[in-house]
Design a protein with these regions (language model features):
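Aromatic-lined carbohydrate-binding surfaces of glycoside hydrolases
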Residues: 2-166
């Protein structure tokens, strides 16, 4: 595949459609056929967490600022410099639709993320009988560390299906 997850924090988080279109066209020129497509992942996650009974505040405090989203997606970091605004989420959805359309027009198979097991603290609080692992990373205070749902939890498959549906 093309691009690495950190590119979406270090390089692309504030790109507009014009910049993305140039990059996608360049990918096609070089024969890239499996580019990562992680734009709007948090908007999809927000829909899933709403369906799982969390409110917007519980969900929004989970996300980092745009430049830190790759580390959030990898389960390293939550909340840092967040939250994301409604306008950001809506713009990212529209941008991702343009990105996916262009990639497919050029014969690419975009690689979109699915559920990796990282859950908002609000989900942990709503399910006290479920075992979660509280991760540590990079010396950040505990409040910024991720919770991981074990893959053998019945919630894991349910949430995973919702991510694919959304």
């Amino acid at each position: 595949y093309f691009l690495n997850v950190c590119t979406f924090g270090c390089t692309t988080p504030y790109w507009d459609w014009e910049r993305w279109e140039k990059e996608i066209d360049r990918m096609a020129l070089y024969g890239v056929n499996m580019p990562l497509a992680t734009v709007a992942s948090e908007a999809i996650a927000e829909r899933v967490w709403l369906r799982m009974g969390l409110n917007k505040e519980e969900i929004r405090e989970f996300f980092t600022a745009p430049a830190h989203l790759p580390w959030h997606r990898m389960g390293n970091l939550n909340k840092w410099d967040g939250p994301l605004s409604d306008a950001w989420q809506q713009n990212q959805i529209a941008l991702q639709h343009q990105i996916l359309t262009r990639m497919r027009e050029l014969g690419m198979q975009p690689i979109a993320p699915a559920f990796a097991g990282f859950v908002p603290e609000g989900f942990v609080q709503k399910h006290p009988d479920t075992q979660f692992r509280h991760m540590r990373w990079g010396g950040f205070d505990e409040e910024y560390n991720a919770y991981v749902l074990p893959p053998d939890s019945p919630f894991f498959e349910e949430i995973g299906k919702l991510f694919v549906e959304e």
